[in-house]
Design a protein with these regions (language model features):
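Juxtamembrane interface elements at the cytosolic ends of transmembrane helices
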Residues: 24-27, 151-156, 167, 187, ...
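Membrane-embedded helical hairpins/re-entrant loop segments and their flanking transmembrane helices
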Residues: 2-9, 34-52, 58, 220-291, ...
């Protein structure tokens, strides 16, 4: 998709619109875990600027508060307090740094082997569909308001011209907000109580994070799913912008930028940040993919974090109004995944491809969740390694069975030597679990000779 060329003024307007898209989720996460919403806005803006600095200003991605860490932050804060928990987020950054170094070391061949189109296509579809539940939950608070904002955005997209056509989301939110006000659904109490200018809470009473090993180690396995989702999001943005960001500036840079942004968020007292699919969906429908526009959104987030009344006004927008907009945005992300499968001519008449796509989608849409212990992780890695080795060696059936039986024997030994149920390491669900399943299936399922030649 070729991006629309805009004047500086129009870039500014669209940039503010993109923040409107990300605002709801960015401030909701800190509210759920007991952090300051204004600080989350500030760290989202700072984190996005760090990301753009590391990626040479080429990748149009906005970083906002990550939902993946809500439960871990709540549990960790009970055990080590919020100061220790924020220091533990450094463990999240470490996972990004290690993945960045691994990708830099192995290069594009590793990514092409782990994430061919038959894997990345359904993962992109899931990024959109997995968010659809959130959109519906927001919209069902008041379906009338949701449909008002949705229909307004659709009418602006299809009938609008000039500048108006570039801001369907703002139009939908503004019209929905006006209707909500007339219906008495908006509470302006916090707007009246908020001061005009104020530093975010964590900055006004800044204190250094208290480093401790236990929360640091606790957060490391939680970061696996966001890292996997990061890879999928970069592929989505590449498809939307019609540029190969995996190659230039490189996935190792995007991964490093995300990790440094998480580190900065912890330092300033905000939640971990992650790539925001909502903004990618907004880019898809507006056809605007300028990185400068995303940086304007980041700057707007920082400005809003210190203007109390503006921040409070945005927080007063009913969830149903935002939900109506999200119904449109998240569906467009899923359509990018379908386009990815079509553009790369993935043959869905092929049994191997059908298995990979169907299992990946079913696990993700069905909401599968697995608990992993240290024992389970080691056994899983061992068995997958045996299957990959057997597939790569192309031995006869007897030798393949012997390799697999050897893996089972070692796994049985590990099962009795290592603790299991009580030593839960992490939980995995959604996109992370589905993506890993797709990667494993792609590695272990044998290809026919004609597929390898293609």
């Amino acid at each position: 998709m070729n991006t629309i060329e805009l004047t500086p003024l129009r870039k500014g307007i669209v940039g503010v619109q993109f923040l409107f898209v990300a605002f709801g989720a960015t401030v909701l996460v800190p509210l759920l875990v007991g952090l300051d919403p204004a600080t989350a806005l500030f760290t989202a803006g700072i984190g996005t600027f760090i990301f753009h600095l590391v990626t040479k200003g080429k990748v149009p991605i906005f970083l906002g508060s990550s939902f993946a860490f809500i439960a871990p932050i709540i549990e960790a804060s009970k055990m080590w307090g919020m100061a220790g928990t924020l220091a533990g987020i450094a463990g999240v950054a470490l996972v990004y740094f290690v993945m960045s170094a691994l990708i830099k070391w192995q290069g594009r061949k590793l990514l092409d082997r782990l994430f061919p189109p038959v894997v990345i296509g359904p993962v992109i579809i899931l990024i959109g569909l997995s968010l659809s539940g959130s959109a519906v939950n927001m919209a069902k608070d008041n379906w009338t308001l949701a449909f008002v904002s949705l229909v307004t955005a659709i009418l602006v997209l299809t009938l609008g011209k000039g500048l108006i056509k570039l801001v369907p989301i703002v139009c939908g939110i503004v019209v929905g907000f006006i209707v909500a006000s007339l219906m008495g659904e908006v509470d302006f109490t916090k707007v009246h109580e908020a001061s005009w200018f104020a530093l975010p809470g964590s900055l006004a009473s800044f204190h250094w994070p208290e480093f401790a090993w236990k929360p640091f180690i606790y957060m490391i396995p939680v970061a696996v799913a966001p890292v996997i989702e990061h890879i999928g999001d970069v592929y989505v943005v590449s498809a939307v912008a019609d540029k190969d960001f995996v190659k230039e500036p490189g996935l190792h840079r995007t991964m490093l930028g995300d990790g440094l942004a998480c580190l900065a968020a912890a330092f300033f007292g905000g939640p971990p940040v992650t790539t925001y699919s909502e903004v990618t969906g907004a880019m898809q429908i507006t056809k605007v993919t300028h990185p400068q526009v995303i940086r304007i959104a980041a700057l707007t987030a920082i400005v809003f974090s210190v203007i109390g009344k503006l921040s409070a006004l945005l927080q007063s927008i009913p969830q149903a109004v935002l939900g109506g907009i999200m119904l449109l945005l998240f569906g467009t992300i899923a359509s990018v995944g379908v386009q990815n499968l079509i553009q790369h001519k993935v043959n869905l008449n092929n049994q191997r491809n059908i298995i990979i796509v169907s299992v990946t989608l079913t696990l993700g849409i069905g909401g599968a969740m697995l608990d992993f212990s240290l024992r389970g992780v080691i056994i899983g890695i061992l068995m997958v390694s045996c299957l990959v080795y057997a597939n790569a060696m192309k031995q006869g059936l007897v030798k393949v069975l012997l390799i697999i039986l050897g893996g089972i024997a070692l796994s049985t030994l590990i099962f009795f030597l290592l603790p299991g149920g009580e030593s839960e390491l992490t939980k995995m669900s959604g996109i992370g679990l589905s993506a890993i399943t797709g990667v494993v299936l792609n590695l272990v399922l044998p290809k026919r000779a004609e597929e390898e030649d293609a």
